[in-house]
Amino acid sequence: MSTSTALHLMDEQDPAPTTIQNTEESLVRVQPALLKILQSAGAKGDMFTLKQVMHYLGQYIMVKGLYDKQHQHIVHCGSDELGKLLGITTFSVKDPRPLYDMLKKNLLRISCTDAGHSPSRNKSQASDSLELEKSFASKTEVTDVIKRNDCVSSDMCTSFDNSHLKGNESSDYTKQSLDFIFEEWDEAGLPWWFLGNLRTNYNLQSIGSTDIPSNQDIDTATVSDTTDDMWFLNDSRTDRINMEVKMESSDSLEEEVGECDSKKPAQMIELTLYEDDDDLDDTQSLSEDTDTEVTSEECWQCTKCHKFNSPVKRYCYRCWALRKDWYLDFPRLIHSSSTPTLPGKVSSQMIVDGLDIPDCRRTVSAPMVGVQVPECRSLVPFLEPLDLAANSKAFSESTDTLLTFKAAEASLLSSRPLLEPCQLCQRRQRNGSVVHGRTAHLVTCFSCACNLKKNQKGCPVCEKPIQMVVKIYVA
């Protein structure tokens, strides 16, 4: 029984894998330069199928450690025999066109006549034929099918040889340049031999019995022993963070306790956050713990819980304690040395006698701390006024400064409720202003405010629809 008869018998029993078997069992002969590389990866013989060549190339790259340890889809082959064969120093598995060009030059398609005369092929054919004869000798129907298929196979081989041996009749077989189309791609653009779709390791002692799986379910890529074939897939993928957020305030929860029995249970909103998603770049750049510009030396340590906080934060992120030596902890402004103290004699003299214009330059005057006298006054000494006028002007300026500081301090004290923790999470600072129309409410942190807007919730205070969320920086 010939090999073509055995193949046709398999076609009759299982029509589905016919196309796969025919395409994958087309043999190619490897040139000596590429054959040396394949044999170093464990290949035996000089005729292989296309998938076997691809498999041993992947094994060679893995065993030699030619792939980049950080970006494992990149192969560095500059100082290796593979690089000399390719003519390049590096290539990417995601774009293996240089590798395919090299295969087209170093693989020759083998005709049916040449494949039938291969020694290793004859051994596998003999063993396969013996097994098939033992299995199906008792079935007359199968015998008829074998005869018919044998005739068809011999006709196909004869027509194949006649069509390709017209140009060179003296040669026993024709070596054709490999002109195949690589369609072994998955949706990600990676070749199948790097995805590890081969279920078993190859044993080329019997090429005919090599079990080459189909590549129909390429999306699932279910394999049994592909640890070595998937060396480049160890790259870190985009991390996904699943969290459940229930945007309900404490007051609304108490009101809805009695209604939970009659209504359906509260819906939990599941959020999936992608770290590399472009839509969340602005949110993550404004988060509290991802300030990349602040170094560890600039952070301040809380005196209560010893947590390091950002220098722009006035409260501890963990225990909400006010930062030590913050400007509110400084003592109130006292009378400085620049504030003049008017002696009683001068004031009484001013009341009784009015302005005293001396007839000579005074040698001793009232305190003039912080008041600069113009130099032009020395040019007209006889018109110099009493120092009391300058002192009264400085006193009025210092009084205005004190009043301004007290007003600012009062405004800070009145805005202290705004510095309380977030109304929803009770943990972060209130820095997310919820804007609706021409008004806004500052009762939540920026993260909770963004979650409210994404889930189309209303304002926690007035239940108005949220138009935008603005982050507030309190300095």
From Swiss-Prot:
It comes from the Eukaryota. PROSITE patterns: SWIB_MDM2 (PS51925), ZF_RANBP2_1 (PS01358), ZF_RANBP2_2 (PS50199). A zinc finger (RING-type) spans 422-463. GO terms for biological process: negative regulation of apoptotic process; positive regulation of mitotic cell cycle; protein ubiquitination; regulation of gene expression; ubiquitin-dependent protein catabolic process. Keywords: Metal-binding, Nucleus, Zinc, Zinc-finger. Its main location: nucleus. A motif (Nuclear localization signal) lies at residues 427-430. Inhibits p53- and p73-mediated cell cycle arrest and apoptosis by binding its transcriptional activation domain. Belongs to the MDM2/MDM4 family. This is Protein Mdm4. It comes from Xenopus laevis (African clawed frog).
